[in-house]
C-alpha cells in the first residue's frame, strides 16, 4: 500500500476523531456516536473481475455498536480532487460490505459512506449513479439511483468548524482558511494526536514539511499549529540558505529565497511574514502569489 494512503488514514482511525467527524457531519454536532461505541472492521474486501481475484480497500471504516448492538458500519473516503467515478466506487464498497454481512450469517445493518473532499473548488463531479451512468428514462423505474454523501471540508461554515472537538477541527480550519483567504493563521489550540495531524496534512497538501516538523518537537512538549509553522518556517529558511550556498552565486541565493517563499506561501504563512523570513520585499512575495494563483 502506498505510504501516502497509510498516512491519510492515520488520524481518522482514532476513535475520538472518527466519532467527532461523524457527529459533526451527520448529526450537526450532536454527540450521538461515542468513541467507546466504535470498533474496527476490515477495510479490505475481495472481488472477482476478468476471472481474477482483486481487492479494494476503504480509507477508514468502523462499526458503530453502542452497548454491543450494531447500528451501522460507517466508512470514510478522502478526496483531494474530484472523481467522476465516486458513485461507482462507493457503490462497490457498500456492496462488498453488505456481501460480507451475508457471509457472516449475523444480523444485517446499514452501511454509510462519507466522502471527505478537501479541494478548494466546489464538488461538481457526479453525486449519484444517474449523474455518472446514462440510464434511459424507460429503465429508470427498474434501476436504483445510488447517491453519495460528499462533504466539502474547505466549505464548512465557521459554526460547523467549531462543532469539532477533536484534532480534526485543526485540519478543517486549515483547509477552510486556505480556501477563503489563501493564508493560514494558526491557532494556539493544543494538538492531541500530533503525528496523525501532521501526517494527514502532509498527505493532503503533498507537503511533507508538516511531517518533518514533528521530529523537531521534544517528547511531551505541548504542540500547536502555531509552533508547527514556526518549525516549518525555520526549516524553509535553512533550506533556502543551503540551496543558495551550494550554488555559490548571487542567482543561487535569490533562487533559494524564492523557493523558500513559495514553500511558506503554500503552507499558508502570511505574505508579510514570508517576506521577512525569505528576505524578499512584499512586492516580490505578492508576485509569487500571483504566479501560484
What do these predicted regions represent?
Residues 1-293:
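Elongated, amphipathic alpha-helical interaction scaffolds
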Amino acid at each position: 500500500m502506498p505510504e501516502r494512503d497509510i498516512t491519510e488514514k492515520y488520524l481518522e482511525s482514532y476513535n475520538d476523531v472518527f466519532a467527532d467527524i461523524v457527529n459533526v457531519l451527520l448529526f450537526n454536532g450532536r454527540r450521538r456516536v461515542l468513541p467507546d461505541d466504535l470498533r474496527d472492521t476490515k477495510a479490505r474486501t475481495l472481488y472477482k473481475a476478468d476471472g481474477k481475484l482483486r481487492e479494494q480497500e476503504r480509507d477508514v471504516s468502523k462499526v458503530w455498536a453502542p452497548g454491543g448492538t450494531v447500528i451501522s458500519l460507517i466508512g470514510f473516503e478522502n478526496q483531494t480532487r474530484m472523481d467522476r467515478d465516486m458513485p461507482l466506487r462507493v457503490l462497490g464498497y457498500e456492496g462488498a460490505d453488505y456481501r460480507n454481512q451475508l457471509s457472516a450469517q449475523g444480523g444485517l445493518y446499514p452501511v454509510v459512506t462519507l466522502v471527505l473532499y478537501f479541494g478548494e473548488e466546489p464538488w461538481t463531479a457526479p453525486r449519484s449513479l444517474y449523474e455518472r451512468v446514462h440510464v434511459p428514462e424507460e429503465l429508470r423505474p427498474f434501476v436504483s439511483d445510488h447517491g453519495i454523501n460528499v462533504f466539502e471540508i474547505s466549505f464548512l461554515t465557521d459554526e460547523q468548524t467549531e462543532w469539532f472537538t477533536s484534532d480534526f477541527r485543526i485540519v478543517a480550519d486549515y483547509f477552510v482558511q486556505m480556501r477563503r483567504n489563501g493564508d493560514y493563521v494558526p491557532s494556539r489550540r493544543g494538538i492531541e494526536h500530533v503525528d496523525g495531524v501532521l501526517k494527514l496534512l502532509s498527505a493532503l497538501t503533498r507537503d511533507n514539511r508538516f511531517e518533518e516538523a514533528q521530529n523537531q518537537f521534544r517528547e511531551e512538549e505541548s504542540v500547536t499549529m502555531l509552533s508547527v509553522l514556526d518549525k516549518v518556517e525555520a526549516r524553509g529558511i535553512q533550506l533556502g540558505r543551503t540551496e543558495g550556498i551550494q550554488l555559490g552565486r548571487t542567482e543561487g541565493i535569490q533562487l533559494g529565497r524564492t523557493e523558500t517563499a513559495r514553500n511558506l506561501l503554500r503552507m499558508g504563512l502570511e505574505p508579510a511574514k514570508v517576506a521577512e523570513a525569505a528576505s524578499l520585499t512584499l512586492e516580490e512575495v505578492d508576485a509569487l502569489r500571483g504566479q501560484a494563483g
